[in-house]
Amino acid sequence: MTSGPKVLVVGAGSPNADMVAEALRTAGVDAEWTDQVKRPSIRRIMRVDVVYGIYLQTCSRYILVAKLLGKITIVHFVGSDAYWVKREPSSWRRRYWRFVLNCCNLIFYVSPHLEQLVGRKGIVLPFPILTATFRNAKRSSAIPDRDVLYYCPSGQTNEKIYRLSWITDFARQHPDEKITIIGNSSHPANYRLELPNVEIIPYVERSQMPTLYKRHKTLIRMTTEDGLARMVHEAILCGLKVIYNGSEVTEVPPEREPAEFASAFKRALADIL
């Protein structure tokens, strides 16, 4: 049974608004979601008390319309959106993003350093992942047939942010290592690399990620714009060794558990109601 203020989760891509809304619903929050971010639905906004946007640049229109309609507004910074605000070259766009943030009753960050980038006080809250699903995958009898899984979606900017040059150098230096490069559904990996030990997978559906992890021994994530990549903790739960920006990661934040995430969200929301 759901109760309390009704929440509309707004977001496109990853982290997925549907997963966040489901975590909230399971914890008793009356939550729905939309990934149709370009044209805010006034009707949907009127039906709810809170508009909760994921990734500033995709949810800003919803935030502004919701504020005009007197709703409580929340933005959750994912990582690259905070870097985007920091490096925005246009003065009028910088003013626009500041205006959107000033319209927010509450701001979440997946990592403390993003708060420093944005310059607006908020609450650190990692997104939930399907922890039970990945723990179950760890218990499977599947034997890895590849060595390294590496995330690097295609695109000139993505190649720099996710350091395509790093993994190609690694592949050349470790010819016996079987390496997989993967992107995501919004930005697939479509590289043509003349490296016999590298396989390119454009992307896989979210439901197939546990199987993909189990095919590999190690996940390596290298990025110039670090947030709190959920792949890092999904892979740990699946039993992989995880290297993130040169350091091994072994711990999973408690808020990755859907129930813990929802409890933290409810506490933060209660403080501003």
Name each model feature, range by range:
Residues 224:
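Aromatic "clamp/platform" in nucleotide-sugar-dependent glycosyltransferases that forms part
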Residues 140-162, 168-174, 179-182:
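Conserved donor-binding/catalytic core segment of Leloir-type glycosyltransferases
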Residues 50, 66-85:
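Active-site proximal beta-strand in glycosyltransferases
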Residues 53-59, 77:
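Short His-centered aromatic/hydrophobic patch
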Residues 129-145, 190-192:
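Acidic anion/phosphate-binding donor-loop and adjacent secondary structure
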Residues 101-124, 186-189:
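A short, active-site helix/loop in glycosyltransferases that binds the activated sugar's phosphate group
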